[in-house]
Amino acid sequence: MIDQKAQDNFFKNHWRSNIHLFKHSGANLVKVINNLKPKFVIDAGCAINFFKGKIPNLVGYDPVFKKADIMCGHFDAPFKPECADVIIALGSVNWGDSDDVAHMLIKIKSWLKPGGRLYMRGAPGGYKSDKGLQWFLWGMKEINYFARLMDFDLEWVEIEHNTTGSDGGTLPDRFWPHRYVWCYKRKLIK
C-alpha cells in the first residue's frame, strides 16, 4: 500500500528536480519525442512540468505540484482510453510493491494507443530523506518482467548516472548512483 501522505511530504519538503542534469531523460528526450510528431502526449507525474512548452500537445498531471496542468494522481486522471501517442512516466511509477506497479501500469497503458510509446525512469532505491516511502526497486529483471506482463515491446534501456550541477540538487542524497531509463512500445493490435 502506498502511503500518499508520506509521498506528498517527501515531494513538498525534500525533493528538487534534477531533470536538467539527466542525459537520457532530460532535454535529449524532448528531441526523441518530438521526432515522433505525436498528436497527444501525457506526462504522468509531471512534477514541475519540465516538458511543458518543449513538447507540443503535452498535458502533465501531478498530485503535488501546482505547475501541473491537472492536479491529480494516476487513478484520477481524466484521460480517455487509447488517446495518447506518447506517455512520459519519469519516476511516477516508483512506489509500492509489484502489484502497485502493475495497477499503475495497467491504468497508464489504457491511455496509450497501439504502437504508442511509454518512456519511463526508475531507480533501484530511494533517498536518505524519504522516511515512510516504499520505493519499488527497479532493475533489468523488473523492466523485462513488466514488459512481458503488460505485453509491451521493450525498445531500449539506458543507465543514467547521478551527476550534480551547481545547485547540487538532491542526487547526493540518493542511496544508488544510477537509475534506469527505458522505452516500452504498446504492441499493435493484430
Task: List the predicted regions and their residue ranges.
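A short SAM/SAH-binding and catalytic strip from SAM-dependent methyltransferases
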Residues: 86-99
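A short acidic, Gly/Pro-enriched loop at the edge of an enzyme's catalytic core
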Residues: 75-87
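Non-membrane alpha-helical structural segments and their capping/turn regions in soluble enzymes
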Residues: 98-102, 137
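A short glycine-rich, Lys/Arg-flanked "PGG" loop and its adjoining helix->strand segment in the class I
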Residues: 102-114
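Class I (Rossmann-like) S-adenosyl-L-methionine-dependent methyltransferase catalytic domain
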Residues: 1-78, 117-190
